[in-house]
Swiss-Prot record:
Topology versus the membrane: Peripheral membrane protein
Protein name, as recorded: Rac-like GTP-binding protein 5
Chain coiled-coil ranges: none
Gene: RAC5
Pfam annotation, one family: Ras
Binding positions for GTP per the UniProt entry: 13-20, 60-64, 118-121
Source organism of this protein record: Oryza sativa subsp. japonica
GO molecular function per UniProt: GDP binding; GTP binding; GTPase activity; protein kinase binding
Function according to Swiss-Prot or TrEMBL: Inactive GDP-bound Rho GTPases reside in the cytosol, are found in a complex with Rho GDP-dissociation inhibitors (Rho GDIs), and are released from the GDI protein in order to translocate to membranes upon activation.
Residue numbers of Cysteine methyl ester PTMs: 194
Alphabetic keyword roster: Cytoplasm, GTP-binding, Lipoprotein, Membrane, Methylation, Nucleotide-binding, Prenylation
BP term (GO), one: positive gravitropism
Family designation: Belongs to the small GTPase superfamily. Rho family.
Residues lipid-modified (S-geranylgeranyl cysteine): 194
Record-linked InterPro entries: P-loop_NTPase (IPR027417), Small_GTP-bd (IPR005225), Small_GTPase (IPR001806), Small_GTPase_Rho (IPR003578)
Length: 197
């Protein structure tokens, strides 16, 4: 029997968007109600997806600016990134293209990205928006638009609190590494027609 493939999966995104809760929810099937650490301890587990066993290594990062110099150290050897934003934070949504994509393209060019919208349970919670009048929900269509803009392999909305789509996020990350999307041929055609004499 062959050894399972190791996949390094790194979470990135603004502080307080729910990266650590997503990892805790996935690895323990529970939602942390009291203390949530800034960074989850690295975790690895054997996971079976579509009949293939992989050893999934999960790396958490801190989104706060204090960690800007340290964070890229965890990018080395990454097979896939989970780029998270909160579905109730327009700023975290905007920072995906303003801050995170430039950082990932600089330190880890070519590594596939799964775009993840977190806190799905709160987007439909009317009371949350009454209590937080400045909060602006991000729609599924806006998430899909952002996925296309940044060239992410997939876009998934999830809730760590209700566990909705949590497994789907990590399954998508594993699948994009095991079965990379085929490169589109459009680029080659465009390059052929761009000869300037």
């Amino acid at each position: 029997m062959s050894a399972s493939r190791f996949i390094k999966c790194v979470t990135v995104g603004d502080g307080a968007v729910g990266k650590t809760c997503m990892l805790i929810s996935y690895t323990s099937n529970t939602f942390p109600t009291d203390y949530v650490p800034t960074v989850f301890d690295n975790f690895s587990a054997n996971v079976v997806v579509d009949g293939s066993t992989v050893n999934l290594g999960l790396w958490d990062t801190a989104g706060q600016e204090d960690y800007n110099r340290l964070r890229p150290l965890s990018y080395r050897g990454a097979d896939v990134f989970l780029l998270a934003f909160s579905l109730i934070s327009k700023a975290s949504y905007e920072n995906v293209s303003k801050k995170w994509i430039p950082e990932l393209r600089h330190y880890a060019p070519g590594v596939p990205i799964i775009l993840v919208g977190t806190k799905l349970d709160l987007r439909d919670d009317k009371q949350f928006f009454v209590d937080h009048p400045g909060a602006v929900p991000i729609s599924t269509a806006q998430g899909e638009e952002l996925r296309k803009l940044i060239g992410a392999a997939a876009y998934i909305e999830c809730s760590s609190k209700t566990q909705q789509n949590i497994k789907a996020v990590f399954d998508a990350a594993i699948k994009v590494v095991l079965q990379p999307p085929k490169q589109k041929k459009k680029k080659k055609k465009a390059q052929k027609g761009c000869a300037i004499l």
